[in-house]
Amino acid sequence: MAEFVMRDLAAKWRAERGAAADIEFEIASAATSTEQLGNEVYPGTRRKLAEHGIGCAGKRARQMNRGDYARYDYLIGMDSLNRRDMTRICGGDPEGKIHLLLDFTGQKRDVADPWYTDDFETTWNDVLAGCTALLAKLTGG
């Protein structure tokens, strides 16, 4: 969900600024485990994104790898288990690139996980708040 929310917010930010938008974004997501590799976006997530006019067609889960640490400026996890696994996969975090999404909101907690609760609305709210705060940090806004 976060990949597509962030893409949507970044596209809107860029559209509002036109030629003045001098920041390039490369936004992607990857799993920290092998459980969902190759799967499409979870149906509940697809529905919630569609409610907000955001598509996710063609996305298939891939696993994060050590090369992602060199490729990206920020590596964002949804929960503390993600952060632990990301740090392990990357062999540490010497450049301080690994963060939790809600850290950017000042809330030191995990994004609500709809896997067991089926509460995609709470997850949407967490992801939107985190992505909005992250975009503001990246753009100085």
Regions found by a protein language model. Name each.
Residues 68, 74, 80-141:
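Phosphate-binding/catalytic loops
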